[in-house]
Amino acid sequence: MKMNLKRLVVTFFSCITFLLKFTIAAAEPPEGFPEPLNPTNFKEELSKGLHIIDFYSPYCPHCKHLAPVWMETWEEFKEESKTLNITFSQVNCIESADLCGDENIEYFPEIRLYNPSGYIKSFTETPRTKESLIAFARRESMDPNNLDTDLDSAKSESQYLEGFDFLELIAGKATRPHLVSFWPTKDMKNSDDSLEFKNCDKCHEFQRTWKIISRQLAVDDINTGHVNCESNPTICEELGFGDLVKITNHRADREPKVALVLPNKTSNNLFDYPNGYSAKSDGYVDFARRTFTNSKFPNITEGELEKKANRDIDFLQERGRVTNNDIHLVFSYDPETVVIEDFDILEYLIEPLSKIPNIYLHQIDKNLINLSRNLFGRMYEKINYDASQTQKVFNKEYFTMNTVTQLPTFFMFKDGDPISYVFPGYSTTEMRNIDAIMDWVKKYSNPLVTEVDSSNLKKLISFQTKSYSDLAIQLISSTDHKHIKGSNKLIKNLLLASWEYEHIRMENNFEEINERRARKADGIKKIKEKKAPANKIVDKMREEIPHMDQKKLLLGYLDISKEKNFFRKYGITGEYKIGDVIIIDKSNNYYYNKDNFGNSLTSNNPQLLREAFVSLNIPSKALYSSKLKGRLINSPFHNVLSFLDIIHGNGMPGYLIVIVLFIAILKGPSIYRRYKVRKHYRAKRNAVGILGNMEKKKNQD
C-alpha cells in the first residue's frame, strides 16, 4: 500500500514538472516579436525613445517563467507603445555578454528603463505580471524627466562632503539649507561618477534622481551634498545609517538615505527624509522646500489666505504636477496678549509637519474667525446653483459651536476649499500639547482632492476611519487636452456634490447635538424633582455633550489612462468609463458604483451623487427610499452570489459560522431523533412498577 502511494506521488509530481516544462517550451513568440538587442544596434535603438529592457539568460529558470509574460505584454501593448513612444525590448546576456557587462547587469532577469542617454531606473515590482509591466510603461512615459536630454547631459549640482564638512553643517555654521544624501561607498567624489555599489541595486538609478533633485533645489537656494558612508562610518552610524557603512545582511538590498540640515541653528536642525526610498524626485524636493520654509514661520495675510481658499484648481495639467493643492496651518495670535512662550510650539511642529506632504506653516497677528465665516458662506453660494430647489441656509449657530476657541490658536485652510478648521484651544494647556495639536492636524491633513493609484489606495481607505466614512473616487483621463479639460470639470462636479452632502451632514450633526442637549436638560430636571443631592445635580450639569465630527468624505480621482488594470488588481468588477464615480465604504471595504436607481454612478448629475452619499451615511435624510447595492472589494464570488460577500468580509469567523450552520442543518434532524429516543428510554427506566415508589411510601408513614 505504501509503495503504491509513493508511486502515485512520484507520478503526480513528474506530470506537473512535465506540464510546466511543456508550458514554458510552448511559449511561442507572437508574430512580429522583435529579436533581442545586441552591441551593434543597442545605442541606435535607444535613440528612438524610451525602452523597457529585459536583460535575461536563456538558461535562467526565472527568465523562462517570465518569457510568456513578456511576450503577452509586448503583444498587448505594441499599438499603445507607438503612441506613448516607449518600447519593450530584450537583451540576451549569453549572446551579448560584453553589453550586459558594460551595463553592470548582476542578476537575471533584470528589467530596466532606458532613454536615449542611458539607464534611468529598474523595474522592481513583484510579481512581474503583464498588468504591472504595462502600468509601469504608462507611468514612466508620462514623466517629463525621462525624456529630458538636457538633464542627462547636465552635471549634478551636489557637492562632495567630507566628514568635517558635514559636522560644520550640523554645528549651525551653514548659511543655506543642505539636503544631503548618504551612500554605501568611499569612492564617489562626484554624484555622477560611474561606480560599482555592493548590495545596492537602487544606487545607480538614484544617482539620476539625485541629479534632478540637486538641479531643482538649486533654483530655491537649497544646496545639495553627498557623503560616502564607508569613509565616514562614525557619522553614518550615529545617524542610524549603519547598513551603509558595511554589509550586515548579504541578502538584503541597501538604499541611499537622505537628510536635511537647516542653517544657522545648533539644535533641531537635522531631519531625516521620512517617506522611504523613491526613484522619483518630487517627494524629496517637497520635503526640503517645505521644511525649510516652515522653519522660518513666515507671516501670511488674510488676503493671501482668502485667495488660496477661493482658488479654482485644475487638478490635471498638461505639463507638470498640480502646484496649488496645498494645506496651510496658521498660528493665529493677538499681539496685545501673546507671550514669547506661546511661539515655542512652532519649533516643535517643524519635524512632525515635515512628514506630511503639502502642508505649510504660517503665522498671523489677528483672529481669523471672520475670514473662516466669510469663506464658509461662499460654499453656500456654490451649492445654491439650482434656483428651482429650496435654497440651503448657512447655519451660523452650528458654525459658532465648532469654532469656539481662544487666541492663540491654529486655523487650517486648503487651496480651493471654502471650509476651514479651527483647533479647539480652550486654554494654554491645549496650545502647548504637541500631541493634541498633531492629532488634530493629521485628521484634516488630506488635500482637497487626492490622486488615487495602486500605491496609495489602501492608505486612503485606512485613513482616519472614525471621521471619514467613505472614499469617493472620480474616474478621469489625462490622455490629451480635451480629456484633461473634461476631467477637471468632472472633479469640480464631485466637489460640488461633496459640499452639498457636507451641508446635510452638518445639519444632521446639529440636530443630534440639540437632541443630546434636550436629553441632558430633561435628566437634570428629573433629578431635581427627585430632590437629589446637590453634588449629583452639579455632576449631571457638568456632563459634556460630545460634538461628533463623523461621516465625512475623502475625495480622490483616478487616471484610468495610467491605471487601466486598477480594477482587476483590487477585484472591483464592472465596466468603467471616464466620468464614473466609485464610492468605497472605508469601514467594511464595500464599493458602490450604482446610484439609487441602479444606473452608473457619475458626477454629471451632482444631485444624484449627493443623494448616494446621503443614502450611505445618513439614510434618514435621503430623498429616496431605495438603498445602494455594494460589493466587497476582492470578493471571490460572482455577482449572482454577491449575498455571500458578507461571509467573506468577516474572514475566517464568517466561514466558521457558515460551516457550523451547515453541519447543524445537515445533522440536526438525526441529532433530534437520537435525543427523542434517549428521552423515551430514560422515561421507561424511571417507571415505578406494581409495587409503587418505595421512597414515597416511606414519606407517607
UniProtKB/Swiss-Prot annotation:
GO MF term set: protein disulfide isomerase activity; protein-disulfide reductase (glutathione) activity; unfolded protein binding
Main subcellular location of this protein, as a coarse class: endoplasmic reticulum
Residues linked to a glycan: N85, N264, N299, N370
Subcellular location: Endoplasmic reticulum membrane
Signal peptide limits: 1-27
Membrane topology (UniProt): Single-pass membrane protein
Transmembrane segments: 646-666
Disulfide linkage: C60-C63, C200-C203
Domain (Thioredoxin): residue spans on this chain: 28-142, 408-446
Keywords per UniProt: Chaperone, Disulfide bond, Endoplasmic reticulum, Glycoprotein, Isomerase, Membrane, Redox-active center, Repeat, Signal, Transmembrane, Transmembrane helix
Gene Ontology terms: cellular component: endoplasmic reticulum; endoplasmic reticulum membrane
Keyword Repeat listed: yes
Keyword Endoplasmic reticulum assigned: yes
EC numbers: 5.3.4.1
Reactions performed catalytically: Catalyzes the rearrangement of -S-S- bonds in proteins
Enzyme class: isomerase
Described function: Acts as a membrane-bound chaperone in endoplasmic reticulum quality control. Probably facilitates presentation of substrate to membrane-bound components of the degradation machinery.
The protein's assembly and partners: Interacts with mutated PMA1-D378N but not wild type PMA1. Interacts with EUG1, KAR2, MPD1 and PDI1.
Additional note from the record: Present with 6020 molecules/cell in log phase SD medium.
Record family assignment: Belongs to the protein disulfide isomerase family.
PANTHER family found in the cross-reference section: PROTEIN DISULFIDE-ISOMERASE C17H9.14C-RELATED, THIOREDOXIN DOMAIN-CONTAINING PROTEIN 5
Protein name (record): ER-retained PMA1-suppressing protein 1
Organism encoding this protein: Saccharomyces cerevisiae (strain ATCC 204508 / S288c)
